[in-house]
Amino acid sequence: MKKLNTANRYLHLNLVIFILLGLIFTCGTAQTSAVGWDQVPAILEKIVPPKFNNKDFDITKFGAIGNGKFDCTQAFVRAVEACHQAGGGRVIVPSGEFLTGAIQLKSNVNLHVTGEGVILFSKDTRKFLPVVYTRFEGMECMNYSPFIYAYEQENLAITGSGVIDGQADNETWWNWVVKKEYGWKEGLPNQEADRDLLLKMADDNIPVNERVFGDGHYLRPNFIQFYKCKNILIENVTLKRSPMWEIHPVLCENMTVRKVTIVSHGPNNDGCNPESCRNVLIKDCYFDTGDDCIAIKSGRNGDGRRIKVPSENIIIQGCRMKDGHGGVVIGSEMSGDVRNIFAENCIMDSPNLDRALRIKTNSLRGGVVENIYMRDVTVGVVSDAVVRIYFYYAEGDVGQYTPVVRNVYIENVSSKQSKYALLLEGYERSPIANVQLKNCRFDGVKKSSIIKNVRDLNMKDVYINGELQ
């Protein structure tokens, strides 16, 4: 009997030790692997704006004349090169209007546009040649240079309270889109054939250096693009009249976009589109755009799957959205996956804003979108749904790459007027999974929510037109 008691005591002791070790391991894991909003402080610690030498390089000292007519392209080239060779500093755009072609930045250069300074980009498309390594709608190609461009550089900035004006309009760039409201007319050249060709090249895995567009073709460049760069700051400037996407970092890391004003109503005039980027902060910006205000991307179709770099750890704080197709958007070019997106303390309000949170995809894109967080967002009027997750975007369900969307958390979001509160539509074979809404109020809703193929939709303290859901 004593032997049995002793054995029991050893068994109990071993069990207690096992439980204690399990608790210690669990606690340790919880402390080192934060989830949800608890991840934000650690991400913010990794996002550090670059610092620059206290040296100024005024473009007028390199031949620029600010009368809005003189071609200052070479003055910008010389100023950027001198700043770079000196170890970095600021390239100063003083008072005046400075006409230029493409500006290519180099490491340790801060392009600083003073309060009375304006950069005017040329309406001559040849000023954006030779072609550079870039992306058009999520596909790699050699095309017209983005208006401000950098490739494989680090410690870069665009700052100052001045204006950067792309001068795109219905006579230049915009009319390459087949839409009469943007100046296109029957018989004029347009982007459709080139766009289809690039899609085929990407799907056929044609080498990028053989995907040459530019002169004689009609794919528009982006406004600002940093490609494979790190340690970036864009702050205080105002952007106007872009050919298409405004701020478009690709394969970048450690980027801050702060207190930027974007007012541009052309076709595909998205405000800020991080693509395959990591550790990005978009804070206190104003968006009034012709397309999505912020759209997070990771490559389109075959190219996105080939490169396979997700966008992740992107924080959006304190922004104001007016016109646009969506306030915070993911997709549709997201074949390389998107995860860990945090949007908080934003205001969205315009009858010309379609949605507050939008995830758009289809079975040509594929990809996984997960861990999307939105809280403390005030929505006035949107014309469509406050929250829209839609698997039938554009081409619809015609591909072989079934998308996955899961873990979407929405808290303390209110709206005054919309067509729908929620429009959630996944596939039967791939339902939208785990959508959590808490403490939300959607008023002035005209139609019942559309919810199809959604698994684990949970609503706590959610009111639609005053009724608890």
Segments the model singles out, each with a brief description of its role:
Residues N14-Q469:
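Extracellular/periplasmic carbohydrate-active domains that bind, remodel
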